[in-house]
Regions:
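Glycine-enriched alpha-helix->loop->beta-strand junction motifs that scaffold or abut catalytic
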Residues: 7-12, 71-72
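Solvent-exposed coil/turn segments that connect beta secondary-structure elements
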Residues: 10, 17, 80, 214-216
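Divalent metal-coordination and catalytic microenvironments
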Residues: 12, 75, 151, 170, ...
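Acidic, glycine-enriched loop/beta-strand segments at the rims
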Residues: 158, 176-181, 189-223
Length: 223
């Protein structure tokens, strides 16, 4: 993780290799992956999930996060992905009206994937969700810039709505509502090098304004 950041990788998505970097087994995990590709690699990554979670070291993670913050790399945790894995699948489909609003071809693809998953969240999925919250909190405390992202339309990650959920999950992980909003506005503008023309509301800048009937700075779900 740190080698990539020091080499110039400006962003990291889905917390890829962040959890691994917070363990003393990062090197052996990565070396094993380098020998594979395609489906065998994906199978290995799944098999490594539990050992990586069990080897998590908070003190090490704090040091890694502080070091990562000095590189300027931005992390896009896409918390909605891990959150989707801990939702009861039948209930998520039957009671969420958004599922019926998804285009038929996307819905068919989702159904094919969801049919292979257990009806209730696994213990491993619950552990991964708790780890996601801990990792995002650690990165935030260390000053690593965070951007809001969703990876929609992954299964049960609804385009549009997922961004609002991501903001709420960032707040759950410890960001203030204002910090979560900046993760979807100012931080991306800085990352793209266009903060002088967008990302904040100011004279001479471009912006799309949304008028709300409640203050998201008090409650992020007011977005």
């Amino acid at each position: 993780l740190l080698e990539a950041a020091h080499a110039g990788q400006r962003s990291g998505e889905h917390l890829t290799q962040v959890n691994e970097a917070c363990t003393p087994i990062e090197s052996e995990v990565i070396v094993a992956r380098r020998q594979l590709e395609g489906e065998p690699l994906m199978d290995l990554r799944v098999a490594q999930d539990l050992p990586v979670l069990q080897a998590y070291d908070q003190a090490l993670c704090d040091r890694v996060a502080r070091a990562l913050a000095t590189t300027g790399q931005v992390q896009v945790p896409t918390m909605v992905l891990a959150h989707a894995e801990v939702q009861p699948l039948p209930a998520a489909r039957q009671h969420d009206p958004q599922f019926r609003q998804v285009p038929a071809d996307v819905r068919a693809r989702w159904n094919g994937i969801l049919a292979t998953l257990p009806a209730a969240p696994s213990d491993l999925s619950m552990q991964k969700w708790k780890a996601t919250l801990a990792l995002v909190a650690t990165l935030h405390r260390a000053g690593v810039p965070l951007m809001a992202g969703t990876d929609a339309p992954s299964p049960l990650v609804y385009p549009g709505h997922a961004l609002h959920l991501e903001l709420a999950l960032l707040v759950e992980a410890g960001l203030s509502p204002a910090e979560a909003l900046r993760a979807a506005t100012l931080v991306p503008a800085r990352y793209l090098g266009i903060a002088d023309e967008s990302g904040t509301i100011a004279i001479g800048k471009r912006a799309d304004l949304v008028l709300l009937d409640a203050d998201p700075l008090r409650d992020i779900t007011n977005t």
